């Protein structure tokens, strides 16, 4: 089993507005290890996406701590959190969130530009990653010129181009037909194996979850492991 790359300790999340006071997550503990594929399942409203956002440092827990590569995110400035996310995490969503005016190649190179890599190196690395996801012939195509499955593969390539320790994926196949979803999911499993990247995936699809190396279920904000 690989080293722990991301962990949550006693995570609780409450949302309050006026008289409304809802506890979405209650005392969640979770470790994510290098190279594992972890599925988070549960009913709508069980806190799956909220947990993913907290683990990614996109929101702060009401109480508890999130550790990314051993660093407590609560003790980091917003700028430091951003640097940690860019260094260690990748994100994939149900909707690809690609920039429509940019080519597939430029979308994938974007995280490398943010890291201030040289343009030639960024282009070379992004081209290699797109080849790994089978899109070496689609480098110059914009998102509107790609199929749904191709757009999601570009999004996966973008998430992986910096070789992150962990990719957080929120319903990454939820907007795809069954055949395309299977292809995208197999790609994620293969890249986890080859690159040693951990994948944490929120999904409603139990059949896909069963193919992950580990599964957890959220029930009324509490975590049930190894079902």
UniProtKB/Swiss-Prot annotation:
Subunit note: The complex is composed of two ATP-binding proteins (LolD) and two transmembrane proteins (LolC and LolE).
Which EC class is the enzyme in? translocase
Q: Which organism is it from?
A: Albidiferax ferrireducens (strain ATCC BAA-621 / DSM 15236 / T118)
Coiled-coil region: none
Q: Name one Pfam family in it.
A: ABC_tran
PROSITE patterns, sorted: ABC_TRANSPORTER_1, ABC_TRANSPORTER_2, LOLD
Residues binding ATP, per UniProt = 42-49
Protein's job: Part of the ABC transporter complex LolCDE involved in the translocation of mature outer membrane-directed lipoproteins, from the inner membrane to the periplasmic chaperone, LolA. Responsible for the formation of the LolA-lipoprotein complex in an ATP-dependent manner.
The record's section on SMART domains has: AAA (SM00382)
Entry-linked PANTHER family: IMPORT ATP-BINDING PROTEIN, LIPOPROTEIN-RELEASING SYSTEM ATP-BINDING PROTEIN LOLD
Instruction: Give a yes or no for keyword Cell membrane in this entry.
Output: yes
Q: Which InterPro entries match?
A: AAA+_ATPase, ABC_transporter-like_ATP-bd, ABC_transporter-like_CS, ABC_transpr_LolD-like, LolD_lipo_ATP-bd, MacB-like_ATP-bd, P-loop_NTPase
Write down what this protein is called. Answer: Lipoprotein-releasing system ATP-binding protein LolD
Q: What residues does the ABC transporter domain cover?
A: 6-227
Q: Where in the cell is it found?
A: Cell inner membrane
Q: What is the topology of this protein in the membrane according to its UniProt annotation?
A: Peripheral membrane protein
Q: Which NCBIfam families match?
A: LolD_lipo_ex
